[in-house]
């Protein structure tokens, strides 16, 4: 084997090893545990999460939601039993972490659950606002919200709650002088 062939062989071995290390690191960072926490959410939030993130809900790596979950995870207090699945509870996967291995840190206290619920509601509002903000100028907003619900896996019973949520968001800003929807000029035809 010539020196040139030896250099190419070494280069390929080093490259293969670096690819192996890169894949190993990325696989470890994206591992979600089989441990879950259960949250009581509004039905439309639960349906929306299941539609986009599966059941149990798995937030993307590096997401704000996973950061909040990790921040408030704690060991199960002595004498307390873990939460069990129920029809009205949403299962959310605990992200694995070197600092807080989920085999030991797999409990969210009441305030931790409120914090996670808060970031989920924020994410929902952002998605709702981003999707509907450009199409509210013309036509029936109610029909557009129904279509949005259908597109995001939310049943028809939740349509009215989501419509009211959207109107409350828009009204809160308009009361402060921030108009997020185009205002129409009044016609002055005689």
What are these regions (language model features)?
Residues 2-108:
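Long, low-complexity interaction regions most often at the N-terminus
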Residues 117-142:
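Short, amphipathic alpha-helical "recognition" segments used to contact nucleic acids or chromatin
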Residues 130, 160, 164, 168:
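DNA-binding alpha-helical recognition surfaces that contact promoter or target DNA
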Residues 133-152, 173:
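Short, charged amphipathic recognition helices of the HTH superfamily
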Residues 149-161:
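Short, basic interhelical loop/turn and adjoining N-cap
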Residues 165-180:
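Short, basic alpha-helical nucleic acid-contact segments in DNA-binding proteins
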Residues 180-190:
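Intrinsically disordered, low-complexity basic tails/linkers immediately adjacent to helix-turn-helix/homeobox/MYB/SANT
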């Amino acid at each position: 084997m010539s020196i040139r062939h030896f250099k190419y062989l070494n280069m390929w071995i080093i490259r293969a090893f670096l690819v192996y290390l890169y894949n190993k690191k990325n696989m470890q960072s994206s591992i979600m545990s089989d441990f879950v926490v259960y949250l009581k959410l509004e039905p439309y939030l639960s349906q929306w999460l299941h539609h986009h993130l599966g059941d149990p809900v798995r937030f993307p790596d590096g997401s704000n939601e996973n950061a909040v979950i990790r921040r408030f995870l704690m060991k199960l207090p002595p004498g307390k039993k873990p939460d069990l699945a129920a029809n009205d509870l949403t299962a959310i996967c605990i992200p694995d972490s070197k600092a807080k291995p989920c085999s030991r840190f797999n409990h969210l206290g009441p305030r931790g659950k409120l914090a996670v619920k808060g970031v989920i509601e924020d994410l929902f509002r952002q998605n709702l606002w981003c999707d509907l903000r450009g199409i509210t100028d013309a036509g029936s907003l109610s029909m557009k919200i129904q279509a949005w619900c259908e597109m995001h896996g939310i049943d028809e019973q939740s349509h009215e709650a989501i419509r009211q949520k959207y109107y409350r968001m828009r009204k809160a800003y308009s009361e402060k002088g921030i108009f997020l929807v185009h205002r129409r000029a009044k016609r002055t035809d005689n």
